[in-house]
UniProtKB/Swiss-Prot annotation:
Subunit structure: Part of the 30S ribosomal subunit. Forms a loose heterodimer with protein S19. Forms two bridges to the 50S subunit in the 70S ribosome.
Gene Ontology biological-process annotations: translation
Keywords from the UniProt entry: Ribonucleoprotein, Ribosomal protein, RNA-binding, rRNA-binding, tRNA-binding
Ranges for region Disordered: 89-123
Organism, scientific name: Cutibacterium acnes (strain DSM 16379 / KPA171202)
Protein's name in the database: Small ribosomal subunit protein uS13
Gene name, Swiss-Prot/TrEMBL: rpsM
Family, per entry: Belongs to the universal ribosomal protein uS13 family.
Biological function: Located at the top of the head of the 30S subunit, it contacts several helices of the 16S rRNA. In the 70S ribosome it contacts the 23S rRNA (bridge B1a) and protein L5 of the 50S subunit (bridge B1b), connecting the 2 subunits; these bridges are implicated in subunit movement. Contacts the tRNAs in the A and P-sites.
Annotated GO CC locations: cytosol; small ribosomal subunit
Lineage of the species this protein comes from: Bacteria, Bacillati, Actinomycetota, Actinomycetes, Propionibacteriales
Top-rank taxon, per record: Bacteria
Length: 123
């Protein structure tokens, strides 16, 4: 396994796909990175030379926020919204969907498992 920015890339996958295992890099950024470094996306990870790995690492570190830095930025953005009391911050604090999705039905992932409600007693 080749290691790039603290992530083990799968050996047998195409480089274009393997780069998406890095948090913050999707298919578009992977393609841009390969084009900028002049490396073919059809190469497999185990076929890379050390020079190519260094070129990839240098380009990614110079141009993108990835992995731990990006995770910290996202967490800080959410914390900031909670602290200043925006609508989105209140939704984060309540554990409800943030972007306007309906909650009368659905939203089970965000709300968690259903809570049992007692039936009405018959008279």
């Amino acid at each position: 396994m080749a290691r790039l920015i603290g992530v083990d890339l799968p050996r047998d996958k195409r480089l274009e796909v393997a780069l998406t295992y890095i948090y913050g890099i999707g298919r578009t950024r992977a393609t841009e990175t390969l084009k900028a470094t002049g490396i073919s996306g059809d190469l497999r990870v185990h076929e890379l030379t050390d020079d190519q790995l260094v070129a990839l690492r240098d380009h990614i570190e110079a141009n993108y926020h990835v992995e731990g830095d990006l995770r910290r930025e996202v967490a800080a953005d959410i914390r900031r919204k909670i602290e200043i009391g925006t609508y989105q911050g209140r939704r984060h604090r309540s554990g409800l969907p943030v972007r306007g999705q309906r909650t009368r039905t659905n939203a089970r992932t965000r709300k968690g498992k259903r809570k049992a409600v007692a039936k009405k007693k018959a008279k």
